[in-house]
Amino acid sequence: MSLIHPTAIVDPKAQLDSSVEVGPYTVIGPDVVIGAGSKIGPHVVVEGHTTIGADNKIFQFASIGAAPQDKKYAGEPTLLTIGDRNTIREFVTINLGTSQDVGITRLGNDNWIMAYVHIAHDCQLGSNIILANNATLAGHVHLEDWVFLGGFTSVHQFCRIGAHAMTAFTAAVSQDIPPFVTAAGNRAVPAGINSEGLKRRGFSSEQIMAIKRGYKTIYRSGLPLEEAKLALQAEEEKSPDAAQYLRQLREFIEASPRGIIR
């Protein structure tokens, strides 16, 4: 029995694994590749040069691989790549990349993308990310693994959000959020570390306390940022069990192109 509903329109050039399910009235374009076990719900549009991995679930009315919402885009053959085991809920929009950046929008594996989320051109998302309803990523945003964005969070173009960071409902992010940090407000400001998330992911109490000390060094010590980075480096030597996480925090800050939230 065919797993493609008879009302679906699948271009003959599209490459779908034989186990892919396609729901009623879904449209799939000629340059689309979809891996084994993926389920595409009803009324979904998948277009552009889009590659979707295995065991993804895409719900009704999602728009995947449409042209970037960028006036400079002139039809270049840019890409969208989605990994494995992602859940993409109703009315999500994910756009292709642009030639002004690397030309590709990427999602990793095991991400949970809730309804009405927008992921703009050239965004780079890692794995195990949760984007709550109506979260909006402008172009060129980078999210590292295990990021959680609260509902209606908006992220300015080119911002980067570090691993295990979290935002509160309606946060408006205009600068980079370091790893492990919780941000809240419009505009978003630091509001502690994501302690509960770290506990759930197996961080020890000693590691969490060391990360908290690192947070206080950056945000509560009163040190200028350059001096705070040196203090973080010294803290790495005092906390061998958490040194890799403190180093991750420091290196993120050093590499931040927009500067971190303050």
Swiss-Prot record:
Gene3D superfamilies reported in the protein's UniProt record: Hexapeptide repeat proteins, Udp N-acetylglucosamine O-acyltransferase, C-terminal domain
Q: In which pathway does it act?
A: Glycolipid biosynthesis; lipid IV(A) biosynthesis; lipid IV(A) from (3R)-3-hydroxytetradecanoyl-[acyl-carrier-protein] and UDP-N-acetyl-alpha-D-glucosamine: step 1/6
Q: Which GO terms describe its molecular function?
A: acyl-[acyl-carrier-protein]-UDP-N-acetylglucosamine O-acyltransferase activity
Where it sits in the cell: the answer is: Cytoplasm
The alphabetical list of record keywords is: Acyltransferase, Cytoplasm, Lipid A biosynthesis, Lipid biosynthesis, Lipid metabolism, Repeat, Transferase
Q: Which GO terms describe its cellular component?
A: cytoplasm; membrane
The record lists the catalysed reaction(s) as: a (3R)-hydroxyacyl-[ACP] + UDP-N-acetyl-alpha-D-glucosamine = a UDP-3-O-[(3R)-3-hydroxyacyl]-N-acetyl-alpha-D-glucosamine + holo-[ACP]
Disulfide feature: none
Tell me, which GO biological process terms does this entry list? lipid A biosynthetic process
Q: What is its EC number?
A: 2.3.1.129
Q: Which InterPro entries match?
A: Acetyltransf_C, Acetyltransf_C_sf, Hexapep, Lipid_A_LpxA, Trimer_LpxA-like_sf
The superkingdom of the source organism is: Bacteria
Instruction: Return the NCBIfam families for the record.
Output: lipid_A_lpxA, PRK05289.1
Q: Which family does it belong to?
A: Belongs to the transferase hexapeptide repeat family. LpxA subfamily.
On assembly, the entry states:
Homotrimer.
What biological function has been recorded for the protein in this entry? Involved in the biosynthesis of lipid A, a phosphorylated glycolipid that anchors the lipopolysaccharide to the outer membrane of the cell.
Q: Which PANTHER family match?
A: ACYL-[ACYL-CARRIER-PROTEIN]--UDP-N-ACETYLGLUCOSAMINE O-ACYLTRANSFERASE, ACYL-[ACYL-CARRIER-PROTEIN]--UDP-N-ACETYLGLUCOSAMINE O-ACYLTRANSFERASE, MITOCHONDRIAL-RELATED
Please give the name of this protein: Acyl-[acyl-carrier-protein]--UDP-N-acetylglucosamine O-acyltransferase
Q: Which organism is it from?
A: Janthinobacterium sp. (strain Marseille) (Minibacterium massiliensis)
